């Protein structure tokens, strides 16, 4: 509806029709008893109004060292684990770590929640970080029965917006242009 505030903003930016939203994540890098309770309350409220959306839960942020360290082992701690359909895992680590994780998802238990790698950042110099990212992505693709979703990070950095070693906008975007990074071709 372009008569609403955000519908008008969307139309002003060249998209009068609504986007076909399928997924929504509840939180970002939230976990623990308070999150598990709040997830259920938010899930119940949203799913009552928008039953066709798929809701994504967050995983604990912990250092992962072993291939069989399935972050989804915390799902039973949610108030109602059956309401956790997709589980978001974030990974930031070294090139060496990424290469060691090539078989990581082979040992994930099946029949739990679907897998979403919402953030993957491999530290290191190009092209080695690109190749190491490929090792993780091959593991994700090889385990397609986990119904994996994947989001690459970083998308683009605008180096003119670096202030006191803090990245401000992480994305360069516009309705009239796009830039494909080397990660796009991986």
Protein language model regions, located:
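Catalytic-core region of carbohydrate-active enzymes that cleave or remodel glycosidic bonds
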Residues: 44-45, 51-55, 76-81, 85-186
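N-terminal catalytic cores of secreted or lumenal carbohydrate-active enzymes
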Residues: 1-75, 81-85
């Amino acid at each position: 509806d372009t008569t609403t505030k955000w519908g008008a903003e969307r139309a002003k930016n060249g998209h009068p029709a609504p986007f076909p939203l399928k997924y929504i994540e509840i939180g970002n890098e939230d976990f623990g008893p308070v999150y598990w309770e709040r997830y259920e309350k938010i899930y119940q409220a949203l799913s009552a109004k928008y039953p066709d959306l798929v809701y994504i839960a967050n995983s604990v942020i912990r250092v992962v060292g072993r291939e069989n360290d399935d972050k989804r082992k915390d799902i039973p701690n949610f108030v109602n684990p059956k309401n956790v359909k997709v589980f978001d895992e974030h990974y930031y680590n070294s090139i060496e770590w990424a290469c060691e994780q090539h078989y990581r998802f082979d040992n994930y238990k099946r029949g739990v929640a679907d897998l979403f790698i919402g953030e993957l950042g491999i530290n290191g110099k190009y092209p080695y970080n690109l190749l190491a990212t490929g090792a993780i992505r091959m593991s994700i693709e090889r385990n397609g029965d986990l119904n994996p979703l994947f989001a690459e990070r970083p998308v683009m950095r605008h180096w003119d917006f670096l202030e006191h070693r803090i990245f401000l906008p992480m994305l360069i975007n516009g309705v009239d242009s796009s830039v494909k990074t080397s990660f796009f071709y991986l």
